[in-house]
């Protein structure tokens, strides 16, 4: 497919060109200061790209520029894709959000919840109920990440060899069985904790469909949508377009760091963070959701299913700050933001720290990639770079503020 291109003048799409120039200048300054290698930003109204800027370099050492067809590791932006894969199976009646996960993955039978202790002295009790598919979709299953360091169960993940998402050398099936052997942090459905749950969903797709996750996504999502640059590895022909990955240094600069092993099909197919993609493909996926399940005559999901995916599912209508299970979730940026089936959802714009319309949904990746859909404004936005920050940064709130300032109708 051709690279993403601008399709309509900003003014004709209800956007202020001068405000968009300020947006570009803001992030170009970060490139000049050595805080970003380069970036791509795209803003679309009504499905047509009204602003597209590619600036800086995708590989600083090699002097290669960011272009419209640059490829990016989108990491956790994989999660909404995995959710769509699950929902296609739900629509076909092959599983339900209410199904116990152990119906398909027996290792999740008889889950146990952490009570106390550390190491070999951990005390657990039987969970009051099963882990259900819907708990995985909403990150309320009680799973975690090993790189967190605020709960004893986090340490148990690290001790089991899964500090990130996978034990070295393991495949998806082996890794998911390992997750199931570890205690839950809390009773399923009672708290929110961002976790490895989408990897479990990826394995669920494999078991229910009888296909490897990469094959299922290629045949059922990427192929029908024309997302030819999205997958779990890059081909020889694509490799030259892949951006270098950087990490943030102590002084706020950047330095190259190892990234996903994308050359050749990976042994571990991560439904949480394994995809590489392009701006064109991300735009296609966002438009599929904005148009409630259909794009260019291809329907992947029913409108009601997309509506279900993109509404808040946290118990009692809570937001992430109220239901979050750890101090990291108790942040002002989580006020007024709920969680759907793989995406965050704005449920109270008056309480969010970044200007967003009611019902705006989307998700981000650890290398500072993000997309969102504001259905009330027929707006989709994406921002791509490749920097893993040491801590929270201002890219996302700055981007939301600057896009909001550009909206004139």
Label for each model-derived stretch:
Residues 362, 367-376:
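Short, surface-exposed beta-strand/loop micro-motifs that present aromatic residues
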């Amino acid at each position: 497919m051709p690279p993403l291109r601008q399709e309509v003048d900003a003014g004709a799409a209800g956007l202020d060109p001068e405000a968009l120039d300020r947006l570009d200048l803001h992030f170009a300054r970060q490139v000049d200061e050595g805080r970003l290698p380069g970036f791509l930003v795209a803003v679309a109204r009504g499905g047509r790209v009204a602003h597209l800027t590619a600036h800086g370099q995708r590989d600083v050492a090699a002097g290669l520029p960011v272009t419209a067809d640059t490829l990016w590791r989108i990491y956790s932006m994989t999660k909404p894709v995995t959710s769509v894969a699950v929902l296609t199976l739900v629509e076909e009646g092959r599983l339900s959000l209410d199904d116990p996960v152990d119906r398909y993955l027996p290792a999740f039978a008889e889950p146990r919840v952490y009570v106390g202790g550390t190491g070999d002295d951990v005390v657990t009790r039987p969970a009051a109920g099963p882990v259900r598919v819907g708990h995985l979709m909403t990150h309320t299953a009680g799973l975690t990440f090993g790189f967190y360091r605020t709960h004893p169960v986090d340490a148990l993940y690290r001790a089991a060899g899964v500090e990130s998402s996978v034990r070295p050398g393991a495949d998806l099936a082996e890794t998911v069985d390992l997750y199931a052997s570890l205690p839950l942090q809390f009773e399923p459905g009672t708290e929110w904790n961002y976790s490895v749950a989408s990897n479990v969903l990826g394995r669920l797709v494999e078991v229910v469909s009888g296909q490897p996750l990469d094959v299922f996504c290629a045949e059922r999502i990427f192929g029908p949508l024309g997302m030819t640059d999205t997958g779990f590895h890059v081909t020889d022909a694509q490799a030259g377009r892949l951006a270098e990955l950087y990490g943030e240094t102590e002084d706020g600069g950047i330095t190259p760091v190892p990234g996903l092993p994308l050359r050749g099909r990976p042994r571990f197919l991560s439904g949480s963070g394994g995809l590489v993609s392009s701006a064109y493909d991300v735009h296609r996926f966002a438009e599929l959701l904005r148009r409630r399940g259909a794009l260019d005559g291809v329907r992947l999901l029913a409108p009601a299913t997309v509506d279900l995916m993109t509404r808040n599912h946290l118990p009692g209508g809570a937001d992430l700050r109220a239901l979050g299970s750890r101090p990291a979730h108790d942040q002002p940026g989580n006020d007024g933001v709920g969680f759907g089936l793989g995406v965050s959802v704005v449920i109270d714009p008056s309480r969010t720290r970044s200007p967003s319309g009611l019902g705006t949904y989307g998700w981000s990746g650890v290398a500072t990639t993000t997309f969102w859909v504001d259905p009330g404004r027929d707006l989709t936005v994406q921002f791509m770079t490749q920097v893993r920050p040491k801590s929270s940064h201002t890219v996302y709130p700055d981007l939301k503020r600057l896009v909001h300032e550009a909206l004139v109708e």
